[in-house]
């Protein structure tokens, strides 16, 4: 049974400005595993990665019906790549199946998350 659906977007230019200020935001939003992947990236891929992970976490929290805050925090949600480069999302706050989707172009990063109860 579907528990929830969440969608979010963020402007690429906004993410670029955040990255230009240093790693403080990335360290707040990304788990240690995500941050390790992030540090290996450069340029456009770095922007897509940070913006995508932030937006996916927003989408997840919307699907949970909580938003980000006391109930669900950035460190409670992790999205890494599988062997084929697909996003695989896990969370300490949800025990069901999580289906993330992400797309981006030169202007916008859009994410979608479906939560399915076991």
UniProtKB/Swiss-Prot annotation:
This is Holo-[acyl-carrier-protein] synthase. InterPro entries: 4-PPantetheinyl_Trfase_dom, 4-PPantetheinyl_Trfase_dom_sf, ACPS, Ppantetheine-prot_Trfase_dom. Its EC number is 2.7.8.7. Its cofactor is Mg(2+). Mg(2+) binds at residues 8, 58. Keywords: Cytoplasm, Fatty acid biosynthesis, Fatty acid metabolism, Lipid biosynthesis, Lipid metabolism, Magnesium, Metal-binding, Transferase. It comes from Lactobacillus acidophilus (strain ATCC 700396 / NCK56 / N2 / NCFM). It comes from the Bacteria. Transfers the 4'-phosphopantetheine moiety from coenzyme A to a Ser of acyl-carrier-protein. It catalyses: apo-[ACP] + CoA = holo-[ACP] + adenosine 3',5'-bisphosphate + H(+). It is an enzyme of class 2 (transferase). GO terms for cellular component: cytoplasm. GO terms for biological process: fatty acid biosynthetic process. GO terms for molecular function: holo-[acyl-carrier-protein] synthase activity; magnesium ion binding. Belongs to the P-Pant transferase superfamily. AcpS family. The gene is acpS. Its main location: cytoplasm. The keyword Cell wall biogenesis/degradation does not apply. HAMAP family: AcpS.
